[in-house]
């Protein structure tokens, strides 16, 4: 007799809390009372776990509580809101999945909360009990209800693979779903030139017969026969240019399409769409900071993003040229990096309208000024103050792009909050495929900056920024991130995008469904380092030895100037090296302090940091000024002279590359101690140069580095442990010099496998093709979302932007 499996309902969080109350009543009351005793406020995960551990110390019988279902709840809780006698807990069983529960500690009652109810309760921390039951809520879930999406957390960030499976499955099940592909190929033109198909092919059946006829003709030709020699025959059959430059490539492309028409599969569909000629003109938005090629790195708001984009466009132009040639076309690609023109350019080229990017032929920086009713803004302003200028900037940029390209771009890429908002405005206006790259979403960098947004408003204007981020990420056709963590965090930490799923700005609006991290628009595409500048220290023939004298002066000079202070007395010691902007999040002063406090580390190694200004009078950045003052205080307090060298921000990338290698010659290490790092370009640079790397476990570096194999993870919130890890490494290297080589080689292997610009550019171009097709197929469904976002922009964002004081100058 066969038995059928018995299915049981997975208990909700509420059920598990209720069951725990029944089984461990006294222990749970003791724990919850401890939470309530801390008073009104927000408890972080470590607070919740610490109190659970504390009651274990009092009574070992409570071990069952910790190891049981309630212990699992506490370990997956991201925060708890305490408003005595209530404790509301936000539980995240796995990335992207949330539940909310509230316990009345006095009455021992438990209730499950909706997102809206939880956020309403949280708002009472700031607003008190509100009588207003009608609050503006942003909810994008209804617009996405019919959209396909994966359900497993492991699928997050692999959006294009899921989309290809969905599209090919639909085509396989329903041949009518092939019609949009035919229409897509038929409407393909560029500046009046028909591409792919002409009007002779009006149906799928005619397409199939034309492909078979073309296949028969092409198979008789030599594989390297140029397209021009058989162009006329193909045109008469219904085919235009774009299939390939030789008979072999055209035949391969046509075989791909025949396979799709006969039995679609995800891999074939992606390969085909990736090769269809779609992208000839690209616009990349990056308005804030000093965007230039020389003398800008280290200036306020100017760092890794500039390096990222300049490396990106070089790789992208190269990939576009290769693809256009292989497609049998003779079009000239154009890439425009659109940024702000700054008349008072501080000795940079940021006051020039057009500047060709070195190492490219067809890529330029196009600068457009910020302007208001008072005229053109001449001076730099903080990225936090740009909001009143962006709408007018977008209008001016549209005109400048049209003049420069003589057409609309095919693809727009936004960078950071301001660039992504401008990209959204342009893509919406032009009907162009839009890609979003956040680099860093500020909401995760400043804890509780949503619930207590009013405290941050005068300095940071986060109400504008968070609103702009929501609009841009939902308007984008696809989003690329450098790491999984940017999207959905880790088992225990929230991702940058995930933090925008549900949050509240009390008194402004409440987000009950801001973004879905399972959305197939998310893709992980990791950048690399420019390998003409960053290459292994062991590559002796390429080493820039002519720079060694200037590097020695930087590191070992005794002169105290505005460019460098401190000194290194013992040149035989390895060097710990760090290079970053001098702000709170980058935590350079934290590294200096942990080094200063560890006498064993000071005995083993020297410390060199390249960061910001040394003279506080030279900085106009609020955070940098505080960090400069702190650095000077640390030098005096711990008497670091002789073991520590502080060098101002260096803008010569070639010398910076050789600086990494010079540090490697000392058998030193690179340390990236940030409290949070979205990706970690300097980590990739250091590893590419063969320098053993220690980097924050909060953010991207945790994915780049395999702990103990290709580098080491450090926790900036536990600096003593981080410094001991460094002591252990250098002590082992002293005893076994091969240990240093092993870690160095492990880092290089990791880079070559995952983090190169060639891999990046190939992937980005393929994504542009697939999502352009998806945009064409799903245009009706996306239209509702965009109209909703447009209303939110006009009715909410505009007022917020207009409330930001207009910068003078």
UniProtKB/Swiss-Prot annotation:
Ranges for region GT-B glycosyltransferase: 278-756
Enzyme class: transferase
SUPFAM superfamilies, sorted: UDP-Glycosyltransferase/glycogen phosphorylase (SSF53756)
A GO molecular-function annotation: sucrose synthase activity
InterPro entries reported for this sequence: Glyco_trans_1, Sucrose_synth_GT-B1, Sucrose_synthase_pln/cyn, SUS_EPBD, SUS_N
One biological process term in Gene Ontology: sucrose metabolic process
Keywords from the named record: Glycosyltransferase, Transferase
Highest rank taxon of the organism: Eukaryota
E.C. number(s) listed in UniProt: 2.4.1.13
Annotated family: Belongs to the glycosyltransferase 1 family. Plant sucrose synthase subfamily.
Function: Sucrose-cleaving enzyme that provides UDP-glucose and fructose for various metabolic pathways.
NCBIfam families: sucr_synth
Descriptive protein name: Sucrose synthase 2
Biological source species: Pisum sativum
Higher taxonomy: Eukaryota, Viridiplantae, Streptophyta, Embryophyta, Tracheophyta
